[in-house]
UniProtKB/Swiss-Prot annotation:
InterPro entries registered for this protein in UniProt: eFR1_2_sf (IPR042226), eRF1_1_Pelota (IPR005140), eRF1_1_sf (IPR024049), eRF1_2 (IPR005141), eRF1_3 (IPR005142), Peptide_chain-rel_eRF1/aRF1 (IPR004403), Ribosomal_eL30-like_sf (IPR029064)
Matches recorded under Pfam families: eRF1_1 (PF03463), eRF1_2 (PF03464), eRF1_3 (PF03465)
Family under the similarity heading: Belongs to the eukaryotic release factor 1 family.
Protein name: Eukaryotic peptide chain release factor subunit 1
SMART domains, alphabetized: eRF1_1 (SM01194)
Superkingdom of the organism of origin: Eukaryota
Location of the protein in the cell: Cytoplasm
NCBIfam families according to UniProt: aRF1_eRF1 (TIGR03676)
Length: 436
């Protein structure tokens, strides 16, 4: 069973991947005239003013001299209004609509009608009627939004800060006056050492308590990871101390030595921990792929890889976590024969039939009624199989091994099942109808 945090992580990665695929598609669409509508509504804005604006735009479009352009613009505006009418109010995260006549590659023009609520709030409202769809503001939703906590600690005081994307924030800081080491011997030296130890302990306690106050919200960490930095042993002592909140200690991703305290030290700590911060982006991926590899190394039978076995596992409802490479190079074709019977086949991208006809190895001819990238089909259908979808990159060592060694598709099973470990790439095509 997955806990609430893991569930949220899966959903977030899926929605980011879905948006990334949509942006890629939109960026490859081109119109023959300025009839492609891009409409973005800020989550704080109301729908009515935009509906009124579109009605006004329809009136203005009647003045366009070219009959073809006038009709295309009017159709795009009408389609946009139809999409807008589906919403009584602006969704919690805002609304994104793209409508217009456009062509993709060498294919002919067709009307595209897309509406969606983004997976996180969009802060900009925008309207454009152009020969391209405008995705600049939508791309900002894909920017890194993870927040990392920083502690800069030395014998003079501590600074607590955070880094989120390109934003660096000082949250809190305080100074401390600790006794220096005592050079003389005798009883006074022993007493001074006790005082110094006590002051140091109190300082660690204050830092630990402030860490909890700053980096815990509603009993949960509010940062993705923590960097402990300083010019002495304080940072290491804190990390080993029982005073350090057990909810925060697992989040420490790096301990760095710096030459300065305060804000200069904060800047240096950010610079020295940049590699660690980049790696944290792949912690979730490393964890899930690592779990997949563990199942294989222990020979539990609770794993599957290769397209054929993975699809079979999905049909049986056995796949707990479906893992696919973000650039999975397969297409899913919907085929109709002369009896109007629809079947499905999956092809490697390079072997996907072109045109609108396909003849199989038995000489049976089919009409190709749909050609969808397999990754997009998984995005739309994975929940029907009762599975969680994990998008794997080849940026981490674990992800790279999964892509190169296991074909970029596999899963973790709920229970053991018999498999052949076959792969689509050894066949002409995989007939999904055997399983779906």
């Amino acid at each position: 069973m997955l806990d609430k945090d893991e569930d949220a992580e899966y959903e977030r990665s899926v929605e980011m991947f879905r948006l990334k695929k949509l942006i890629h598609k939109l960026d490859n669409l081109k119109g023959s005239g300025t009839s492609m509508i891009s409409l973005i509504i800020n989550y704080k804005d109301q729908i009515n003013p935009f509906m009124k604006m579109l009605v006004d735009e329809v009136g203005k479009a009647s003045n366009i001299k070219s009959r073809v352009t006038r009709q295309n613009v009017t159709d795009a505006l009408t389609s946009t209004m139809e999409k807008l009418k589906l919403y009584n109010k602006t969704p919690n995260n805002g609304l994104i609509i793209y409508c217009g006549l456009a062509s993709e590659g060498d294919s002919g023009e067709k009307m595209f009608k897309i509406d969606m609520e983004p997976f996180k709030p969009i802060n900009t409202s925008l309207y454009r009627c152009d020969s391209v769809f405008h995705t600049e503001e939508v791309k900002k939703l894909l920017e890194d939004n993870d927040r990392f906590g920083f502690l800069i600690m030395d014998g003079n005081g501590s600074l607590f800060g955070s880094v989120q994307g390109a934003t660096r924030t000082v949250i809190q800081k305080f100074l401390v006056d600790l006794p220096k080491k005592h050079g003389r011997g005798g009883q006074s030296s022993n007493r001074f050492a006790r005082i110094r130890t006590e002051r140091r302990h109190n300082y660690l306690r204050k830092v630990a308590e402030t860490m909890t106050a700053v980096f815990i919200t509603n009993d949960r960490p509010n940062v993705k990871g923590l960097i402990l930095a300083g010019s002495a042993d304080f940072k290491t002592d804190l990390n080993k101390s029982d005073l350090f909140d057990p909810r925060l200690s697992p989040l420490v991703i790096k301990i760095v030595d710096i030459a300065y305290g305060g804000e200069n030290g904060f800047n240096q700590a950010i610079e020295l921990s940049s590699d660690a911060l980049r790696n944290v982006k792949f912690v979730h991926e490393k964890k899930i792929v690592g779990r997949f590899f563990d199942e294989i190394s222990k020979d539990t039978g609770r794993f599957v890889f290769g397209l054929k076995d993975t699809m079979e596992g999905l049909e049986y409802g056995a796949v707990e976590v479906l893992m696919i490479f973000e650039n999975l190079e397969h297409n899913r074709l919907s085929l109709k024969d002369n009896n109007n019977t629809v079947t499905f086949k999956i092809f490697p991208k390079k072997e996907t039939p072109s045109g609108n006809k396909f003849r199989d190895e038995n000489g049976v001819e089919y009409e190709i009624i749909d050609n969808t990238p397999l990754s997009e089909w998984f995005l739309d259908n994975y929940k029907k199989f009762g599975t969680h979808l994990e998008i794997i990159t080849d940026k981490s060592s674990e992800g790279n091994q999964f892509v190169k060694g296991f074909g970029g598709i596999g899963g973790i099973l709920r229970y053991k099942m018999e498999q052949t470990h076959g792969d689509v790439e050894t066949e002409d095509a995989f007939n999904e109808d055997d399983f779906i």
